[in-house]
Amino acid sequence: MVNEKRMRETFEELVRIYAPSKGEREVCDLLKKKLKALGASEIIEDNNGSVEGGDSGNLIAVFPANAEGLPSVALTAHMDCVECCRGIDPVLEGSVYRSRGETILGSDDK
């Protein structure tokens, strides 16, 4: 079951972080903390940041199986946002998030 309150709080926290390409360290650190709290048995950060000139690598999180015989699932996403992602203040209108109009929402994978 989805914890809607936690989902909204996490979304709002993530979109407020300034994270242009090659500057995703703050998002990376936050995701590591949240993945650990969700029960990841292993969290790996690769060296892609140093190879590509960024300040963080790709994250790989492993969660233990919770049922026998079910297939594995992989989720992928990126942590950066287009350059105009500074000063984002998301607004919830009904069930839809929007920007206030001065910025993008910057939520494509967040």
What are these language model-derived features?
Residues 1, 47-48, 75-77:
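Intrinsically disordered, low-complexity segments enriched in polar/charged residues with Gly/Pro
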Residues 1-25:
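N-terminal capping segment at the start of a domain
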Residues 55, 69-110:
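Active-site metal-coordination/substrate-binding segment of hydrolases
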Residues 4-9, 35, 90-96:
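Short amphipathic alpha-helical segments, especially helix-boundary/capping motifs
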Residues 20-69:
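A non-catalytic alpha/beta surface segment that caps or lines the substrate-entry region
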